[in-house]
Amino acid sequence: MANTGSWELAAQKLDQYDSIVIFHHVRPDGDCLGSQFGLRELLRVNYPHKKVYAIGDNCGLFSNFLEFDFDEVPSDEVLKKSLGVVVDANQKDRIFMREVLDKNLFAETLRIDHHPNEDDLDKVSVWLEEQRIAAAEMIAELAFQKDWKITEKAANYVFLGIVTDSGRFQFSDTSARTHELASYLYKNNLNPEKVYLGLAQTSLEDLKAQSALMSSLKTNGQVAYIQIDYKSTIALGKQPNDMARPNMIGNIKGYPIWLSFNEEQSGKIRVEFRSNGPIVRNVALKWGGGGHDRASGCMISTFDDVEKIVADCNEEVIRWQKEIKE
């Protein structure tokens, strides 16, 4: 899906409704949560007459330094007069509390996203910019263009999304505009130390989890990968979402693609693809997933498919190497 819509379109829809319900995606991360709560805080501060709801569950993520006080789902009568907003996601099966969307009660829906994938949302307007490093960067753009008042809470949430999805401003889609908008947050009440210290904080249990993942490290061809089953995750006192850490093994010399395979409670296995060049999205799409060129994901049913995915990734490395030589 090509870039579509604009901040003006998003602003028009947000201005139009006095009741707004904001969703995040399943297996939440810093970008979807930062975008969701950043937008809620910005709207509440700048439009105090509006009722703005953030629904879902952060699954304990980032609660050590930021507050995620989710709202109750409004009544059906309220939903009928509301704008539903999906940030950082597209398909309903990727959206937390999709059952609310499945009712098709919203007057309209708005999608704010940087993933180049089609959606199946009802009565939807889309603002999609694939080159953005994070959906939170788009929320920052909206705040900048609308000259909204930015509280410390709002700035911290939005900065969380930008920092985590950009890998601390290291990933390839980080742009001059990313830095300009981060600077704008610095000028408008951001507490960067709170965010960075919160993200850096670890525990003995975290170190044990990292050790378990590192002990599973394998290589095949030019692909490095780690994997862990659900039983081992629980034995470590963790939940599956805590163990999705592909960048632990990122950028090992000679391995331009790195993967993590993480079994969830359902028995399904979450696959995270990362690279510093090859287009891993091609492999993710083959396996029913999607995402960005160098950061994608999919779900598989069995660890028996691990070697097949690794083989596909090695083929993608070879294809990429041929391209850069031409």
Summary of predicted features, one role per range:
Residues 38-40, 101-104, 127-128, 180:
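Glycine-rich, phosphate-binding/catalytic loops in enzymes
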Residues 2-24, 34-65, 74-82, 164-286, ...:
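Hydrophobic helix-and-loop "lid/oligomerization" segment in the mid-to-C-terminal part
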Residues 23, 27, 86, 111, ...:
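Generic enzyme active-site microenvironment
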Residues 1-9, 101-110, 131-135, 139:
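An acidic intrinsically disordered interaction segment
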Residues 29-33:
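Short N-terminal binding/cap micro-motifs at the start of the first secondary-structure element
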Residues 64-125:
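Active-site cofactor/cluster-binding pocket
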